[in-house]
Amino acid sequence: MIKLRLKRFGKKKEASFRIVACNSTSRRDGRPLQELGFYNPRTKETRLDTEALRTRLTQGAQPTNVVRTLLEKGGLLEKTERPSIAIGKARLEKEKLAKAKTKDGDNDSSKAESESNEAET
């Protein structure tokens, strides 16, 4: 399977990346089949070879998550909501609701205790 991934190059602590098409079993910095673009995370500079990327995508190449994000920003792919992000947001909302319920439950139980203490006296 052909993957679209980032190939690291540059100095230590000053990494830049090339967007490349390579076999999924090859090394990260191994010899690619084709270089398709460039990405510098420090300056946010991105250069994409749109024709070559479209060709590779129509041939069935699978982009990694980071490359998919870069292609979405470049307008080559439609933005899609990733399930892992949606699940994380849903989990956070459930936790917030659970915390709110426990706080309300604690307040109700303390009121009930104070009422029972008043009833005894």
From Swiss-Prot:
Comp. bias intervals (Basic and acidic residues): 97-114
GO biological process, one term: translation
Domain of life of the native organism: Bacteria
GO cellular component: cytoplasm; small ribosomal subunit
Classification via Pfam families: Ribosomal_S16 (PF00886)
InterPro entries documented for this protein: Ribosomal_bS16, Ribosomal_bS16_CS, Ribosomal_bS16_dom_sf
Record key words, sorted: Ribonucleoprotein, Ribosomal protein
One term of GO molecular function: structural constituent of ribosome
Position of the signal peptide: none
Region (Disordered): 97-121
NCBIfam families associated with the record: S16
Family assignment from sequence similarity: Belongs to the bacterial ribosomal protein bS16 family.
Protein name, as recorded: Small ribosomal subunit protein bS16
Source organism per UniProt: Prochlorococcus marinus (strain MIT 9301)
